[in-house]
């Protein structure tokens, strides 16, 4: 095994014409990741949020030319070439469809849709309009970490089983994350990351089974005005900010799964995905572990990033071998701009997003009915 191999395929962002962006949804993710990156590396033309004060504050903080309360007005703004959709889950698909109808390139946050019908409509509209559309989370296709992982798995034989875990204590800035009717819960918010990785590495599973539970029946979230007034220079303007200085006080009833376990059957090889909103800390264990007939691989959030144990020996890959790993939000923006400039189809396309959505919905059905759901 050669340790000097390098997997990174740098995106030629410096050579790509900057795009004029509009961002729909001015919440935590937008202000932490998309807005500051676009403002630094592209052109931020406009922002929109149904809470007008959030739009105004975000525009002022990041230098957007215009702000809107109505997303449709942003979508019809001729100065906007591309949009980022980072709203609550139930509005992702309608806004993606509208963006395509308006001829706007777009990045849509996960989940792309909450029904197969909506996902199919997005695919149709994108194909008809010819816009470039990126479905999040893009890291399974854009991150050099997962390109390296895929390369390492190629020589390890048959997939036997794998464990995939994502969890934290839960978001405090919106009640929508806990509302099943709004597409809330850990499946669509957190398990989606590992489902997207599994679909990229192994394709669609033959069948899935799942269990979901509501471990904490009531949660506390911030007052909407608290999340709004937090948009200022001494919070997001200084770096990534997650309301550490604010105490949630508004009780909300939890109707969406906050604890979830899914099993994906790949022709006998089983992948187990675990996601939760209830862990206050994380153990120092690899969140991704894969076991094959000829070896095993673990992926770590700290160095070394990948550890491979095979019959031929053991080796580790760090940042030196793998390359720069951008936050996927940033990689998606640059990839969209590159694809627009070159007239190419993006890797995390809406067709790929459709496959991820199909598996997510099957897992949701399995968890709610207690039955195994076939995808074959």
Where are the model-predicted features located?
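Rossmann-like dinucleotide-binding domain that binds NAD(P)(H)
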Residues: 177-271, 277-282, 351
């Amino acid at each position: 095994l050669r340790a000097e191999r390098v997997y990174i395929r740098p995106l030629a962002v410096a050579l790509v014409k900057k795009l004029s962006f509009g961002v729909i949804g001015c919440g935590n993710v937008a202000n932490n990741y998309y807005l500051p990156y676009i403002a630094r590396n592209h052109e931020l033309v406009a922002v929109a949020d149904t809470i007008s004060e959030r739009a105004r504050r975000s525009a002022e903080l990041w230098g957007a030319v215009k702000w809107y309360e109505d997303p449709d007005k942003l979508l019809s703004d001729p100065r906007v070439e591309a949009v980022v959709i980072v709203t609550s889950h139930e509005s992702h698909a309608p806004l993606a469809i509208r963006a395509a109808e308006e001829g706007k390139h777009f990045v849509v946050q996960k989940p792309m849709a909450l029904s197969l019908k909506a996902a199919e409509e997005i695919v149709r509209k994108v194909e008809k309009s010819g816009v470039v559309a990126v479905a999040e989370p893009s890291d399974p296709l854009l991150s050099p970490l997962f390109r390296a992982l895929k390369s390492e798995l190629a020589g390890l034989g048959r997939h036997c089983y794998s464990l995939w875990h994502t969890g934290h204590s839960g978001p405090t800035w919106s009640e929508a994350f806990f509302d099943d009717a709004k597409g809330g819960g850990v499946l669509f918010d957190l398990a989606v990351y590992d489902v997207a990785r599994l679909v990229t590495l192994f394709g669609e599973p033959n069948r899935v089974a799942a269990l979901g539970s509501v471990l904490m029946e009531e949660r506390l979230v911030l007052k909407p005005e608290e999340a709004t007034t937090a948009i200022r220079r001494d919070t997001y303007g200084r770096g990534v900010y997650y309301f550490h200085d604010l105490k949630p006080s508004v009780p909300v009833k939890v109707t969406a799964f906050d604890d979830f376990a899914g099993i994906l059957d790949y022709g006998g090889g089983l992948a187990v995905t675990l996601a939760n909103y209830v862990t206050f800390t994380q153990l120092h264990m690899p969140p991704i572990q894969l076991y094959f007939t000829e070896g095993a691989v673990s992926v770590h959030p700290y160095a070394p990033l990948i550890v491979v144990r095979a019959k031929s020996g053991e080796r580790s890959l760090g940042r030196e071998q793998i390359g720069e790993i951008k936050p996927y939000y940033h990689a998606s923006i640059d990839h969209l701009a590159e694809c627009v400039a070159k007239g190419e189809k993006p890797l995390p396309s809406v067709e790929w997003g459709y496959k991820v959505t199909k598996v997510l919905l099957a897992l949701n059905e399995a968890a709610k009915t207690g039955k195994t759901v076939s995808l074959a």
